[in-house]
């Protein structure tokens, strides 16, 4: 029992202890709840963040559902981490606020647009400056033009396409200067090509500069490049042909824009540059040995000299003798110094003598002519030029070239370049110099050589005079002195001012200045009118040729008879129609060129009138059925002829009105009377001449209306009488007597005003006109022979073929 009681008490004690422990645990849980409450406060601070609130609510639910203390504590710790994360969310606000900073960046797009607009403004401004420079260039103000071009280049971007065009214009200015600045022009072309490598104008201008500098190989390279880029460029083709002719005349050949040398002959045996340098080395070794011997000899003689006496030491090398006195009382140091100086002097003299004695063999190649010569080592360019002059006496001014390691022909212009040619030819054997003939202005030594030649001739003659008479005059001495002074001062006294060239230059400049002015527009307009008139009259005359051809076709039918008459008539009709079509085409072209020339309208009306008569009488000759024949085309011919003749009358009246309004320009008449149709005219009375023209046009219009009335009558048209009455009115306007004309045709009328057979009695009409001309001298100025010529055209020879009767009634 006691044991049981003890066990029970022990269990109660354990139970009480466990309850105490549970109570302590519960207290810590309250602390957790208090912590959770503080977390709720934290969540309330970040109420604006929906995600954090949702997380906090979820944590509160977790706390209420916590079954164990460890889970709660772990949750609380996790909540602390969440709070720290929530607190870090405040840092995100400034990042969001930085979006406002993006607005100005977006606004910079407008700045980009403004920059693009600014670029367009710069380009337009540069083009304006370029146009101003072009105007100054046309006025020969090259400095002002280059200034404008320079301003345009400053405005444009460096890699803009317009820069190449402007620099090409600058190169043109340099080329036009006196004398031409071709080197600067080439530099500008290089800058233009650096922006646009395929700029044709820059390549052509650089080629012209190279040609002016006689660098034909470089000029040919640029021009061939232009030909490849633009095969149809006429200027490039012209320059290529010119360069080829120039190079071929000098014995050179062109193979695909590469200059080839002529075939060389077999080289004679001579000293090569390697042997030349070896020879020079032997001379130097020999000189060194001799100098050592001189030194030993001088030392030995120095030892034999007694102190109280003076001895003479002689050192002899080649042709030079060096004497040196050595005093006996001098110290050994001074004696040694003098010996060293003696050795150096002897060595230098021997070196100079050896170099002067050594020459090198060279070849001069001119076209197919190759000649040998000798040159001293390290000679000057002028010396080389003298040798060329001696070897080729017939040549005047030349350039001397050598072939470099790349195979290009390089012109030698300085002594340094001559040294470079010697270095590049060491591996080629005998040195070769290529002689190219140029103009005297391009050879800097030509003037000096000419003066030296004259001086030599003068000196020879002077010596001959001295030897011949034993004395000379002061004048000869003055002439010689003048030649020497001219050579030294480089004064060209023989050059005089060419007044003719200067006058022509000033004249051309003045003409260009006048041409570019506003006052030149009037003469230009008058010149344009004259050229238009010349072109229109040429086409007008060509139309006359076709009309004459059509009439000639018809005149060949006279005397034709037999069965083949109809075929020949048809062939002649078709050929005449073709000639009429060609004449009409030429007249219409003349009308487009010179629409205010009344002669064009008159010629076109006459052509349409003759074509209408040709078609109508061909129908009559062919005996076609007039009821089924389509006559609309012939009627249209008559209407067009009448319209054009009236138009010519209107243009003539307008010309007269213009002459009256501008009496000062009375001589500026665009269209005058054509001599072929009008014959001789009175130049002293323009009003009388105009009256004659109007009368002639009225008669031509009368003939058109009369022929039309005949056709309309045959076709049973009701308005034939109107055409006939209009023709009678025109006869009256032309100055004829209406009663006489009516009397002629009255025999053809019958009762009821029906036309039985209208025939134009040519002989009677001409007789009446002759009587009027004799009585009244044709107050309107139209002679009867002209009227006869016009009226005879009413029926061609095709309508008078034998054995063919034309029935009209």
UniProtKB/Swiss-Prot annotation:
Biased composition (Basic and acidic residues): 307-339
Sequence segments annotated as region (Disordered): 1-22, 288-339, 656-686
Keywords, sorted A to Z: Phosphoprotein, Repeat, TPR repeat
TPR repeats: 126-159, 164-199, 200-233, 235-265, 274-311, 508-541, 563-597, 615-648, 709-741
Domain PB1: 359-438
Pfam families, alphabetized: PB1
Top-level taxon: Eukaryota
Classification via InterPro entries: PB1-like, PB1_dom, PHOX1-4, TPR-like_helical_dom_sf, TPR_rpt
Phenotypic consequence of gene deletion: Phox1, phox3 and phox4 triple mutants and phox1, phox2, phox3 and phox4 quadruple mutants show a 70% reduction in root hair growth.
Gene3D superfamilies in alphabetical order: Phosphatidylinositol 3-kinase Catalytic Subunit, Chain A, domain 1, Tetratricopeptide repeat domain
Coiled coil: none
PANTHER family per record: PROTEIN CLMP1, PROTEIN PHOX3
Record's function text: Carboxylate clamp type tetratricopeptide repeat protein that may act as a potential Hsp90/Hsp70 co-chaperone. Contributes to polar growth of root hairs.
Protein name: Protein PHOX3
Organism: Arabidopsis thaliana (Mouse-ear cress)
Taxonomic lineage from the root: Eukaryota, Viridiplantae, Streptophyta, Embryophyta, Tracheophyta
GN (gene name): PHOX3
């Amino acid at each position: 029992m006691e044991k049981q009681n003890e066990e029970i008490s022990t269990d109660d004690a354990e139970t009480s202890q466990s309850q105490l422990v549970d109570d302590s645990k519960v207290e810590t849980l309250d602390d957790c709840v208090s912590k959770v409450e503080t977390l709720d406060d934290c969540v309330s601070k970040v109420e604006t963040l929906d995600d954090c609130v949702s997380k906090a609510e979820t944590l509160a639910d977790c706390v209420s559902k916590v079954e164990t203390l460890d889970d709660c504590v772990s949750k609380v710790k996790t909540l602390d981490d969440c709070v720290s994360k929530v607190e870090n969310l405040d840092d995100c606000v400034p990042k969001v606020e930085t979006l406002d900073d993006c607005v100005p960046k977006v606004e910079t797009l407008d700045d980009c647009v403004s920059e693009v607009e600014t670029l367009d403004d710069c380009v337009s401004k540069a083009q304006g400056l370029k146009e101003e420079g072009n105007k100054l260039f046309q006025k020969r103000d090259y400095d002002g033009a280059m200034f404008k071009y320079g301003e345009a280049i400053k405005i444009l971007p460096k890699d803009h396409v317009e820069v190449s065009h402007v620099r090409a214009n600058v190169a043109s200015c340099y080329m036009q200067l006196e004398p031409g600045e071709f080197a600067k022009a080439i530099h500008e072309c290089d800058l233009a090509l650096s922006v646009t490598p395929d700029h044709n104008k820059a390549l052509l201008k650089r080629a012209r500069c190279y040609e002016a500098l006689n660098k034909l190989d470089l000029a040919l390279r640029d021009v061939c490049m232009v030909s490849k880029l633009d095969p149809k460029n006429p200027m490039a083709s012209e320059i290529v042909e010119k360069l080829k002719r120039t190079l071929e005349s000098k014995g050179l050949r062109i193979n695909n824009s590469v200059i080839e040398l002529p075939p060389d002959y077999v080289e004679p045996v001579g000293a090569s540059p390697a042997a030349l340098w070896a020879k020079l080395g032997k001379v130097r070794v020999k000189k060194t040995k001799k100098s050592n011997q001189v030194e030993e000899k001088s030392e030995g003689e120095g030892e034999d000299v007694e102190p109280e006496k003076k001895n003479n030491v002689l050192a002899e090398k080649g042709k030079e003798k060096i004497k040196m006195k050595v005093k006996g009382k001098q110290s050994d140091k001074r004696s040694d110094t003098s010996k060293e100086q003696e050795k150096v002097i002897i060595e230098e003299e021997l070196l100079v003598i050896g170099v002067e004695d050594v020459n090198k063999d060279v070849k001069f190649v001119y076209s197919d002519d190759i000649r040998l010569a000798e040159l001293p080592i390290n000679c000057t360019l002028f010396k080389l030029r003298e040798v060329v002059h001696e070897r080729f006496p017939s040549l005047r001014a030349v350039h001397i070239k050598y072939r470099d390691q790349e195979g290009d022909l390089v012109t030698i212009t300085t002594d340094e370049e001559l040294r470079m040619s010697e270095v590049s030819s060491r591996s080629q054997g005998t040195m070769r110099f290529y002689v190219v003939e140029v103009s005297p202005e391009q050879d800097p030594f030509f003037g000096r050589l000419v003066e030296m030649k004259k001086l030599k001739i003068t000196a020879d003659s002077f010596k001959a005079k001295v030897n011949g008479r034993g004395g000379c005059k002061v004048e000869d001495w003055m002439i010689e002195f003048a030649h020497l002074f001219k050579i030294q001062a480089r004064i060209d006294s023989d050059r005089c001012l060419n007044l003719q060239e200067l006058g022509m230059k000033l004249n051309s400049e003045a003409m260009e200045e006048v041409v570019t002015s506003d006052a030149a527009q009037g003469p230009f307009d008058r010149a344009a009118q004259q050229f238009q008139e010349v072109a229109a009259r040429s086409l007008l005359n060509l139309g006359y040729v076709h009309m004459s051809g059509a009439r000639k076709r018809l005149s060949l039918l006279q005397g034709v008879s037999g069965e083949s008459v109809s075929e020949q008539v048809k062939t002649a009709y078709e050929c005449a129609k073709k000639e009429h079509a060609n004449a009409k085409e030429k007249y219409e072209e003349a009308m487009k060129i010179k629409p205010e020339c009344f002669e064009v309208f008159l010629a076109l009306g006459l052509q349409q009138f003759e074509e209408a008569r040709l078609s109508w009488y061909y129908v009559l000759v062919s005996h076609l059925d007039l009821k089924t024949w389509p006559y609309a085309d012939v009627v249209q011919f008559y209407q067009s002829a009448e319209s054009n003749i009236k138009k010519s009358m209107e243009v003539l009246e307008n010309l007269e009105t213009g002459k009256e309004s501008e009496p000062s320009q009375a001589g500026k008449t665009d269209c005058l009377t054509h001599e072929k149709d009008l014959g001789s005219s009175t130049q002293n009375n323009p009003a009388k001449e105009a009256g004659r023209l109007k009368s002639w046009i009225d008669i031509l219009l009368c003939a058109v209306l009369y022929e039309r009335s005949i056709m309309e009558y045959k076709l049973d048209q009701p308005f034939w009488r109107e055409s006939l009455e209009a023709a009678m009115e025109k006869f009256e306007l032309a100055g004829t007597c209406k009663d006489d004309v009516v009397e002629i045709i009255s025999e053809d009328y019958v009762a009821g005003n029906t036309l039985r057979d209208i025939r134009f009695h040519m002989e009677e009409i001409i007789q009446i006109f002759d009587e009027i001309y004799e009585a009244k001298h044709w107050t309107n100025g139209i002679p009867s022979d002209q009227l006869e010529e016009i009226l005879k055209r009413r029926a061609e020879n095709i309508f008078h073929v034998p054995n063919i009767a034309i029935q009209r009634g």
